[in-house]
Every structure is written in structure tokens, then in C-alpha cells.
UniProtKB/Swiss-Prot annotation:
Induction: Expressed only in the forespore compartment of sporulating cells. The keyword Nucleotidyltransferase does not apply. Belongs to the Tlp family. Coiled coil: none annotated. Keywords: Sporulation. The gene is tlp. It comes from the Bacteria. It is found in: Spore core. Pfam families: Tlp. InterPro entries: SASP_thioredoxin-like. This is Small, acid-soluble spore protein Tlp.
């Protein structure tokens, strides 16, 4: 039976930062498309962007946690 791989957290901060950047870009693209959307679609886009903002806040908190763990020698 193969042994499970050890938990490698060494690049979590970088991965999370990339995810934050991608989410910000998705928000910007969605806002650009709103001008062509119906009022109903605009509200859906606004709601989705609010959820994206919440996700960004959670990812940034996780970045802080991962950076602190890295500083204290956890890998």
C-alpha cells in the first residue's frame, strides 16, 4: 500500500496570492460585462462579486496564517 504524501505547505502563500489575484481579475471582468447585462443579470453579477470579495477576505486571512506558520518553522 503506498504511503500518503507528506503535507507540503511550502508554496501555499504563493498559491493563495495567485488565487486572490485571479479572483480580483474575475471581479473586474464581471464589472465590465455588467454594462451589457439586463438589470436581473446585473444583480446576479453584483451578488457573485460580493461572494468573491468574501472569498478574497478569507484567502487573505489564510495567507496571514500560512505566512505566520512559515515564520515559525511549520512546513
Amino acid at each position: 500500500m503506498p504511503r500518503p504524501k507528506p503535507d507540503d505547505r511550502s508554496d501555499n502563500v504563493e498559491k493563495l496570492q495567485e488565487m486572490v489575484q485571479n479572483t480580483i481579475e474575475n471581479i473586474q471582468k464581471a464589472e465590465e460585462t455588467m454594462q451589457f447585462a439586463s438589470p436581473e443579470e446585473q444583480e446576479k453579477i453584483r451578488a457573485k462579486n460580493r461572494r468573491r470579495e468574501e472569498a478574497i477576505a478569507a484567502m487573505r486571512a489564510e495567507i496571514r496564517d500560512e505566512a505566520a506558520a512559515r515564520e515559525h518553522g511549520c512546513q
